[in-house]
Amino acid sequence: MRRIILLFTIFFVLITESQAQEAVFLGTEEVDRAVIIAGDTLTLPFDMSREKRLLPEDIRNKREGWYATGLPELTVDPIRGLTVGANAFLFNNNDRTDPFYYFTPYRIRYAMGLRVAQNGRIDAELNVDVPFIFNSKWRFRGDFIYANDPNWQYFGIGSQTLNNLRYQDKRTGNIVENARFPQYYENLALTRPGRGPAFGEDPNETYTDVHFNEVDYSQFLLGLALERTFFEGRMRLMLGAEILVIGIEQYDKRTTVEAIDINTGEETGAVQGQTRLTRDFLAGQQGDANSSWARFNIGGYNGGRIGLLQTGLMWDTRDLEPDPSRGMFLEYAQEISATWTGSEFDFTKHLVQGMFYQRVLPNSLGRTVFASRFALGYIRGNNIPFTEVLDLWGASEGGGIPVLGGARALRGYREGRFAGMVTALANIELRSRFYQTTIMNQHMAFSAVPFLDAGRVYDSFGDMSLDNIKVNPGIGLRLAWNQATILRMDYARSAEDAQFFFVFGHTF
């Protein structure tokens, strides 16, 4: 632990010393107020709504010029174990003589991330975001992402994924209903004898189901997007293109050393039995009337190339994108994948969502923001990769929402736990700032965040109802570092599981 703290301190000092900018605050509160008022005399090249102007306290705390932020990332989750990595950000705010200084969190942002997990997962990404590029109404965004996850989660597709976890205990033969995930997973990992040729298994071999809900997933992604603002910056029209190359490797019949010997309880080697992905794929191939893959035209068993044309229409009155305290964000986003977009698949995706932010206490009592999000996603097509069903793509700078479960959706449920053709999601948070300070020229603001997540998947719009909605409460902590970098710690508990996350960025 001391070594980790030492490495963190060295990294922090190096980042701090790289700043050319002096202290954030100019001097007295009166001087700061005078500078903010002077900003009103600067002329924008086009009209911007006053709703888009940053709050006075955000302007006072905003840095000028170029600066860098970043942190080593140490996380632990039940899927990947310990993850070690780093996220680095390079920002340019220009100075207070730039009229856009008072309307945007940054003029340029470069971001880089690299993470390596105990389970072998690797993530690397490069991003660039330039609002009001060349002092115009246009915004440019670019992304390059590589990821490989040997434990990518798959629990099926359709409303049947809403069923509570159940399993047959390999030791007693009893059926366990309403299981919690740790016990469910432990039972999968236990060894068992082969079930015979009817199941494609050798009765003389020792098998396990430890990877039943997992696939070995990899992706290369290149995405480019342009946005243009209308109505004094409130409306944004987005047009983008994305190429995504997906690799899928199944665990069926592979020897794994992650099995647990049913007699000794020790880790041992065994042959992986049929996975959930293969079972669903074969049911679709055989024309099973109950197969979700056959009913919904699901494909992508071996991965493939996905070419996407993306469009989005957004109404945005938030005051500060990375950490809003007021305003709303409304969005309709659409993705089209077809042969003419360079894709091996044929589908369309739609997302409608709204995010709302409102300060609920007087300024004298501190900054407390009530934040909420409501989202509805839909996917249809003649050949839909199963991986796309588990992603609600969004046109905004925040990107899509992996559904349903995990760090950005239902935080108390396993990642990818619920997936359907129609997805509904709601999140409510109370972001209450309780302390802020400046350390080594770095502005830090801390907030406590109780939250509630709710969601459900459906096979079609005609099936929509309010029964069997999945809910989890939770508590979190936020650190806003120089306003534009948000560190998030969340703990959530559900009927199935309890999970902790330490990641960058608000949930929404």
Identify the function of each model-found stretch.
Residues A68-G70, I108-M112, W138-F144, M235-L239, ...:
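Transmembrane beta-strands of outer-membrane beta-barrel proteins
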Residues A68-G70, V84-A86, I122-L126, F220-L224, ...:
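Hydrophobic, lipid-facing positions within transmembrane beta-strands of outer-membrane proteins
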Residues R60-G70, L74-N302, L404, L487, ...:
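Gram-negative/organellar outer-membrane beta-barrel architecture
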Residues M1-L42:
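Cleavable N-terminal export/targeting peptides
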Residues M112-G113, Y207-F212, R295-G299, I336-G342, ...:
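Extracellular loop and loop/strand-boundary signature of outer-membrane beta-barrel proteins
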Residues G299, I306-M314, R318-T438:
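C-terminal outer-membrane beta-barrel translocator/porin domains of Gram-negative envelope proteins
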Residues L54-Y67, R80, N94-R107, I133-F140, ...:
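Short loop/turn motifs that connect adjacent beta-strands in outer-membrane beta-barrel proteins
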Residues F91-D95, G113-N119, I133, A147-N151, ...:
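Sequence/structural signature of outer-membrane beta-barrel proteins
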